[in-house]
Amino acid sequence: MTFFDFESHQAMTDANCIFCKIIAGQIPSRKVYEDEHVFAFHDIAPWAPIHFLIIPKLHIPSMAQLTTEHAALMGHMMTLAPKLALQEGCNPYPDGGFRIVLNNGTEGGQEVHHLHMHVMGGSRPWLRG
């Protein structure tokens, strides 16, 4: 699998980005997983009993900035999500499960402008009437 060429894009971070600071270890987090391409950590204000984020180490502000060069990276995030969901305590498919949310842009609910995937499982507070 070919990922985005991180070696030639080492400077692609944002010094003011809270997620870039978490990746750099400047802000503490409860790490779920890390490899050379992504970092996953528990949400500080969870909406569900299991709620963590998967973020690319490369600073990509939103889905609007994705290119075909990022396809393998996004595929990696998508295939990693179910593995981490099970690891963190989600019940397996089909009776269990989890939800993936990718907010895009301010009007789409994105609060931190560094691409991130919410993975939530357990009770479903978003179904409240």
Language-model region placement:
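HIT superfamily nucleotide-processing domains
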Residues: T2-G129
